[in-house]
Amino acid sequence: MNEQGLSEKEIFSYLEDVKSEDTDYYRVLSSMCTHPHRIAVEAHRLFIEANLGDLGLFAGAHRLEKEVIRMLGELLHAQSVEIPSGEACESSVCGYLTTGGTESNIQAIRGMKNLVTEDGKKSGEILNIVVPESAHFSFDKVANMMGIEVKRASLDPEFRVDIASAESLIDANTIGLVGIAGNTEFGQVDPIEELSKLALENELFLHVDAAFGGFVIPFLEKPYSFDFKVPGVTSIAIDPHKMGLSTIPSGALLFRSPFFMDSLKVNTPYLTTKSQFTLTGTRSGASAAATYAVMKYLGREGYRKNVQYCMQLTTKLVKEARKFGFEPLIEPVMNVVDLRVPNPDIVREQLLKKFGWNVSITRNPRSLRLVLMPHNTARDIEEFLQDLRKVTTEL
């Protein structure tokens, strides 16, 4: 650290230089994040100092968090929604704002583990959860952090979890199941209703990772059952900083009832509240303000238009790609497309090296993974496909 302070001009000159190293979203077809809405940015700045880790000091930011959770609960068909106020939830469905899907997934599984061990069930055993092979890598972190075995169920031909496979993995030490509503690689929605039946029959918890799909599925033309309408669902992860167009970090975790939320409680004797239910202590009140602002500003109609736009791009990409002989692995469920191309790893490398396109690769099978986000345009799609054709022709 320098002894004497630098001038603002020097600092911001350096910051501008460094920022130029970041990739402009214009050439990004791999990220599930995008530019936050301008109103979210403005609201974020207004509450930049607010710390939701000390609710008594930042009652206004806390009020916004409660309102965001209420709106998310309505979106996910919760009957009534509240976040903890002090020691307990004030009504049936509880939740709080997280840093994103990883934290939400960790906390959901932590809650499962706490509940079964507090009740004296399965104590001393190596507990396990059953997740799809398509589950996010955050569940590997769960295994490492909590000493829980993560069993991976195989996928069906449409890349949804195979229910028979999931059922075969359940044993006496299984504490919960996980379903994905908009998985990262394929954009597919697992059969949550069937997982719910399996969970209820075996007295297991069921967590739904809708980090990406939570702001997409409710606005698709085709309906999917994935949320609290499904009786066995006990918790849901949803990320406003993805298709919700909020600022980073803005995630959320919702529980069906205080029973699940209470399992996360720790005492905080030196703060303005007696307890916390969160993983992190300090939390961004600015993210709560940003999410509140953009959800109120756009409303359901605005989000519906946002999803329609992305799905129009998705349809265009698939239609035009087929003209060049590139078929999708599956017909896209949402704004994620996986294209069958020869030597996808080499194609990905050449697309970046020669044309600056950022795309990614699915693991099994290997294919070119593309995410169509609000920052993309029809012109982007046309340019990308021309460049893709050039790269594959040269192989």
Curated annotation (Swiss-Prot):
Name of the gene this protein is made from: mfnA
Function, as annotated: Catalyzes the decarboxylation of L-tyrosine to produce tyramine for methanofuran biosynthesis. Can also catalyze the decarboxylation of L-aspartate to produce beta-alanine for coenzyme A (CoA) biosynthesis.
Protein name in the entry: Probable L-tyrosine/L-aspartate decarboxylase
GO biological process: carboxylic acid metabolic process; coenzyme A biosynthetic process; methanofuran biosynthetic process
Sites bearing N6-(pyridoxal phosphate)lysine, chain numbering: K242
Keyword Lyase: yes
UniProt keyword Ligase, yes or no: no
Names of required cofactors: pyridoxal 5'-phosphate
Keyword terms: Decarboxylase, Lyase, Pyridoxal phosphate
Enzyme class: lyase
